[in-house]
Amino acid sequence: MKIRASIRKICEKCRLIRRRGRIIVICSNPRHKQRQG
């Protein structure tokens, strides 16, 4: 999980979703997991 100020999709399988007021990226590739911090 990478914590970043600005997050974006890395590949076409990345999905931007909102959980508990935080924007996170989920993907089939575990290296692409991100959270806005």
Curated annotation (Swiss-Prot):
A GO term, aspect molecular function: structural constituent of ribosome
Alphabetized UniProt keyword annotations: Chloroplast, Plastid, Ribonucleoprotein, Ribosomal protein
Subcellular location: Plastid, Chloroplast
GO biological process assignments: translation
Predominant place of localization: plastid
Annotated S-S bridges: none
Superkingdom of source: Eukaryota
Signal peptide extent: none
GO annotations of cellular component type: chloroplast; ribonucleoprotein complex; ribosome
SUPFAM superfamilies: Ribosomal protein L36
PANTHER family: 50S RIBOSOMAL PROTEIN L36, CHLOROPLASTIC, LARGE RIBOSOMAL SUBUNIT PROTEIN BL36C
Entry's family note: Belongs to the bacterial ribosomal protein bL36 family.
Name of the molecule in the record: Large ribosomal subunit protein bL36c
Species assigned in the record: Nicotiana tomentosiformis
